[in-house]
Amino acid sequence: GRSEDKRSVVMATRSTGINFLSLRESAGIQYYDFYNSFTKITSFKQLEKMKGMFGVKKNYNVGYAIDRSASSSDYFSDDSRVKYFNIGFSGYGDATRVETEKKYLDSKYLTSVYFHSFYPAKEKIIRVKVPDWLELDLREYNFADYKITKQKTTEKNMTVYTFKMLNVPGLKSESRGIGIAYTYPHIVFVVKSFSNDGKKENGFADVGDLYNWYKFLYQKTVN
């Protein structure tokens, strides 16, 4: 794709599907996602199995998404916004599913993905589809102390990397603890280069590419 200033960029789509199961008689959670002028949430659904025609249970969109500014300042505002569901569970074993899709208008802003979240998970699967025209570096951090399986397969005109982790505990919050990037396993995405109409475009292959990007951002600023 192309950015607002007509530069060639790699666009990315992040699709998420989560099944939530209540382990208490009465519980409530809030599922949220942030976006801004560089990203766009194209789908945001809360699904539950309900009886439809002929008694067949199907997933129906039952959630009401709230969309608001993520900035609370009375003096400064930015383009950060948040979309979220308030999800309630009426009893033990209640289940609901959330499915979302977010588009990154420039893949530079899709930096990393983590296996852990605030809620424990029986299974976490991260699947990355890399088209043939894209040179993407998947950098694995803090994998050594965790049992994470990795599989590489091919589909039509793309390579698929599948990471899987079982029995994932929830994130721990500790006072004055170091950032999760130093302790929890995650994958960092680095676009090294890509082909556009037969022409090779640079991403972040080395420090020089990063410097050129910073220089471009600096030149765009108005003092």
Go through the PLM ranges and name each one.
Residues 1-221:
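Beta-strand-rich, non-transmembrane domain signature
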